[in-house]
Amino acid sequence: RKLETADVMRGEETELMGLNVDITDSLVLLPGSHSKCITVSSDSKIVDFHTYLTGEMTHAISKDTILSKTVNMKCEPDRKYLKIGYEYCAKKGINETLFKTRILDMIFKTDGNQSYGFFMGGLLYGEINRIISFPQRRIVVAGKKELKYPTVFLLKEYSEKEIICVDDASADNAPTMGLLKIYSYVGS
């Protein structure tokens, strides 16, 4: 076994089946507590996938560190600061970027949306940078809206790939629709 090819999928395949958009020959991103990046072939088969811990990191760092007073996850991330956080992380790394989130609040008096944008830009840097490196030209993004929209924005800003954002209702209903699809296959 090799660490770089070992991974687990526990339910995301059901969510994938329930999406109401064409996912053939695409990367499908399902941001959530465990964000999945799934490669789907031209004949609709899962051929590869990667898991990222961005959702849990976002929650843990924003709730259980000195950033808990700075990062409000109920805010809307400021797009300008998403880019600033992303670019800062590219130059200085995740640890310094996270601490600078606090500095922005303390010294520069950024508002909640700006602080949250910088924070999310930094946290998403590694995941976005990895996704951009894949050869697929088409990326479909569903999943939890709190991570979906910053992910879509940064992908559109920093890649030349076609980005399709699944609407919230379809993304939210995808697990149920996937179960119904599986049931219809098994029941036939």
Q: For the regions a protein language model found, what residue spans apply to each?
A:
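Adenine-nucleotide phosphate-binding core of ATP-dependent small-molecule kinases
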Residues: E87-R130
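Gly/Ser/Thr-rich loops at beta-strand to alpha-helix junctions
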Residues: L30-K36, K144-Y149
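Glycine-rich phosphate-binding loop plus the immediately following alpha-helix
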Residues: K2-V28, K36-K92
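Short hydrophobic/aromatic-enriched beta-strand-loop microsegments
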Residues: I46-Y52, Y158-D168
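Conserved active-site and cofactor/substrate-binding residues in soluble primary-metabolism enzymes
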Residues: R10-T14, Y52, E56, G93, ...
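Short, surface-exposed connector motifs at secondary-structure boundaries
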Residues: I132-R138, K161
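Glycine-rich phosphate-binding/hydrolytic loop that grips phosphoryl groups
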Residues: C165-S188
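Glycine-rich phosphate-binding loops at beta-strand->alpha-helix junctions
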Residues: R137-L154, D172
